[in-house]
Regions:
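Macrodomain-like recognition of ADP-ribose-binding/processing modules
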Residues: 1-162
Length: 162
């Protein structure tokens, strides 16, 4: 659980989400993000502050409603957005980064997302002490694909830079 909603509401960040809904860019959205420092998270009686980056993933599933997007264009947008998120974290001196299967619930293929993450992380290898992918092991196969791309559960679950 977190206070993320409270932070967004209290800080009047909903205009960000409304703007994204009005500017869908064929379902690909645009390269915009919110960096929210020190959001409270609670779990099993413990609490901790973490910074949060909110950035709309390219929604490949929604593309069918709009003009088609080529595979190459989708890949480039996805790569650009993932690099953008990592650069925001680096610029804000985040040392431990927790990521998810970015865009996979919007039709992006887990293997491609993992490959792009791996390449972008390698380009920024000295930027983070640790990167953790928090991906539930469900029937959708996202976890398994990330493990395969990152070659082992240890490297995948707790990728240590350097």
């Amino acid at each position: 659980q977190s206070f993320l909603y409270n932070v967004l509401y209290a800080s009047n960040f909903f205009h960000y989400y409304i703007w994204n809904k009005q500017n869908r860019n064929r379902g690909m959205y645009l390269k915009r993000a919110l960096y929210l420092p020190e959001v409270w998270f609670f779990r099993d009686g413990a609490h901790r502050k973490c910074d949060v980056i909110s950035c709309a993933a390219p929604n490949l599933s929604a593309v069918q409603e709009y003009r088609p997007v080529s595979k190459e264009e989708n890949t480039e947008i996805l790569r650009s957005r993932i690099a953008f998120i990592l650069d925001i974290a680096r610029e804000n001196e985040v040392d431990h980064l927790i990521l998810g299967a970015y865009g996979c619930s919007f039709g992006q293929k887990a293997e491609e997302v993992a490959e792009i993450f791996k390449g972008c992380i390698q380009e920024r290898a000295d930027s983070f002490d640790a990167i953790i992918f928090a991906i539930p092991d469900r029937e959708n196969g996202n976890y398994r694909k990330f493990v395969e791309v990152f070659e082992s559960k240890r490297e995948y679950c707790s990728y240590t830079a350097g």
